[in-house]
Curated annotation (Swiss-Prot):
The keyword Protein biosynthesis does not apply. Belongs to the ALG6/ALG8 glucosyltransferase family. One of its GO terms (biological process) is protein N-linked glycosylation. It catalyses: an alpha-D-Man-(1->2)-alpha-D-Man-(1->2)-alpha-D-Man-(1->3)-[alpha-D-Man-(1->2)-alpha-D-Man-(1->3)-[alpha-D-Man-(1->2)-alpha-D-Man-(1->6)]-alpha-D-Man-(1->6)]-beta-D-Man-(1->4)-beta-D-GlcNAc-(1->4)-alpha-D-GlcNAc-diphospho-di-trans,poly-cis-dolichol + a di-trans,poly-cis-dolichyl beta-D-glucosyl phosphate = an alpha-D-Glc-(1->3)-alpha-D-Man-(1->2)-alpha-D-Man-(1->2)-alpha-D-Man-(1->3)-[alpha-D-Man-(1->2)-alpha-D-Man-(1->3)-[alpha-D-Man-(1->2)-alpha-D-Man-(1->6)]-alpha-D-Man-(1->6)]-beta-D-Man-(1->4)-beta-D-GlcNAc-(1->4)-alpha-D-GlcNAc-diphospho-di-trans,poly-cis-dolichol + a di-trans,poly-cis-dolichyl phosphate + H(+). Dolichyl pyrophosphate Man9GlcNAc2 alpha-1,3-glucosyltransferase that operates in the biosynthetic pathway of dolichol-linked oligosaccharides, the glycan precursors employed in protein asparagine (N)-glycosylation. The assembly of dolichol-linked oligosaccharides begins on the cytosolic side of the endoplasmic reticulum membrane and finishes in its lumen. The sequential addition of sugars to dolichol pyrophosphate produces dolichol-linked oligosaccharides containing fourteen sugars, including two GlcNAcs, nine mannoses and three glucoses. GO terms for cellular component: endoplasmic reticulum membrane. The chain crosses the membrane at residues 3-23, 115-135, 144-164, 173-193, 230-250, 298-318, 333-353, 362-382, 386-406, 438-458, 469-489. This is Dolichyl pyrophosphate Man9GlcNAc2 alpha-1,3-glucosyltransferase. Keywords: Endoplasmic reticulum, Glycoprotein, Glycosyltransferase, Membrane, Transferase, Transmembrane, Transmembrane helix. Glycans are attached at residue 59.
Amino acid sequence: MESWPWMAVVVLLGLTVRWTVSLSSYSGAGKPPMFGDYEAQRHWQEITLNLPVKQWYFNSSDNNLLYWGLDYPPLTAYHSLLCAYVAKFINPDWVALHTSRGYESQAHKLFMRATVLAADLLIYVPAVLLYCYSLKEISPKRKIASALCILLYPGLILIDYGHFQYNSVSLGFALWGVLGVSWDWDLLGSLAFCLALNYKQMELYHSLPFFCFLLGKCFKKGLKGKGLALFIRIACTVLASFLLCWLPFLTEREHALQVVRRLFPVDRGLFEDKVANIWCSVNVFLKIKDTLPRHIQIAISFCFTLLSLLPACIKLTVRPSCKGFRFTLVSCALSFFLFSFQVHEKSILLVSLPVCLVLTEIPFMSTWFLLVSTFSMLPLLLKDELLLPSVVTVMAFVIACGTFFPMLENTSEEQLQLKSFAVSVRRHLPGFTFLPRIMQCLFLSSVITMVLLTILSVTLDPPQKLPDLFPVLICFVSCVNFVFFLVYFNIVIMWDSKNGRNRKKIE
């Protein structure tokens, strides 16, 4: 318990950084007619407050779906409604139907930022603290350090408090789910993850590891006895939670189908804007987004996604463990980001959360990944005029991680979790003893490339014939890094012989 005062200091530091970033610009500030995600969140408050539930997801004269139509699950809509009631109490003009479109003021900005902070404090921050405090076999100092580094992760701060979204809500629920199933509170863990999934459909990135881990637990208990009972209880919990969230939309079949259509808009294409995944990178050379029929794009992305995540999921099902679960969360989320259909640049945050959870186990690789994930969103951050907050938060994160987890000192085969893999390789190549040096060189090359591209993007104008040169280069470089990380995490998973024997609650 003596570490809790220091945990309080960590929280205050994290909140200070968050609120400082919130003083900066936001998505679409002063840019009519569509503005940006800030206006989207405000508009959803306007719609949910002034229209009946049955009209929230339907196009009408009062709800133009082409103007930031609601396209997130019901729990997001309920959250918007809750915020709308508070907004109406403070100033009804903020959420007045039609007349509030594009509303901007310092008071309203303060309110919107405060709603993000409140959600963070209620859901995400407590989950992070509990997770770090519950880590086993590490010192209290290391627990505090891990909490500090996670709370200072710049990607989430810049998107939620700069660009403006509520990612901490879905990620927080997902983290509560991780805690629940890791402690064998499987029903509570399942409920928490269902809340995450009903807040943002992109939490599907984490769904297969949850399913495989819980299914593996049921298999271990025996599907003819306790395992079957556990499976039924979990299934009932999932069905009940979805039923409660979707109840207002299940009165009519067409209503439910319309919500599903809004959640999965296949007409938007293979990817949006510049995103650091395989399809956007390949599209630079082969215009697959424009030449291939939409159903072929969906089929190809589905097949590649499934093939890339299948090995890790199979192993987790056969040999369920807390450690395997965390690493499979990383691998599967990264597979979805790289290969799935309709990916946004901000979806990398879904990979960053589980990477934060393995920070104490592989600090070198985790820190490296988290830096690349933030860099991959640089075009969006520059568009929102968030260069200064980006530089400052990244530097703060690097200093924190470098102080408590000296990165270049944590690159031995054991610390990289690659000992088993290296031993296997040395059976065929006895001279393969330079893996740590390779990783250090790759890290330095990656960091230098990111720094150079950042400087070039800020200081130089692109050629007139290539206006998107720097965003494309940033996405391509980030994608190459992510493919490398996908290979790395799968090697760790497949060569880890401890997964099947490890039964500790939180390692």
